[in-house]
């Protein structure tokens, strides 16, 4: 498998003129040519544009600097995030020919920082899935073991970094869609506090949970990308008005840090997984305490009710009238039915149907409103926990990467892949997945840390120090 150095190494190399932006793009091109046919991580690749941009930067002697910290560095973008003039398919037949007329705020900020957008990555259709098997463009294979999934829904973004097709990538995370693929591919996946990163230009799945996230090789790289894309945005009223704190990354573990593992997240966990997550802390001399958060056990059920309901509303816009696929029939209703019937995949239809049912008269109180009450109670339980500790520890996923096709026809089993990443998402908390130094059958295991709301900088700083000690 090919690879590329992390941003934290490429940036000083560019500054010292040990390589050029074109050299980096050429390495990426070779990696894509060597791996992409087997892995299927990209939906579109912009190699010619990237080469042109790299040459322009080199000719002008523009290297990473305070105004353009990512000058010459290739970044991949999940294909549910808008890049002006390029396709934004959401891996769905209904948007297969859609061209975005504008840049998402995060893309605009990356471009302003000098980044080269190398391509758009594969995903589960409309980001609905945990294995990248619902994409109309085919499954993404895990570069570490091509018989295994890369995770989902941001499987393409994770796989691209794992084989060296970009230096960093953006994914999206509604209930684990960036953290779980990062765990499966041995990478870092950081989900910021809800509202820290603008969602403008992200195609909506469940608006109250969706977040754009960096997927990188190191915590330092994730912190750099986050520092560029985070901050208030007048186009997204859910963003915090304050500029996020600057991360001070240190290799020294802060003294007196209190970490608790969530009891309910380890009760039914495989013993090998448990050891791979706990042992690194024992090795570094960090004492863990046990903390019970009983409500996390119901998080998947509440997450599904709420996200399916929001999806049924958000995806109502795909009707074949204004944009996207249109299957013309004699009558308007027939056109709607034919367009959505042919344009949307099985899993997306399932979620829309269940979500619509949960919002229907006579059932909304029993399902949707009950889930909202649960969400509020869960958030309070997390707040109470953080009055006692600084960080909470849990697995990122219940297993290492599973085989392609293993869960595809078992929706419940697939949904439970997100059992450890939905509760902190529902509570709008920042969380990060970092790879354990211990593997299981040569496959990586993700360690997840969660911090109080808006403590993103503190979480990144601690995760960076922990990563260095691992």
Indicate residue ranges for each PLM-predicted region.
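Gly/Ser-rich, acidic/histidine-flanked active-site/gating loops
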Residues: 72, 84, 211, 234-312, ...
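Enzymes and membrane/adaptor proteins characterized by extended Gly/Ser/Thr/Asp/Glu-rich
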Residues: 69-106
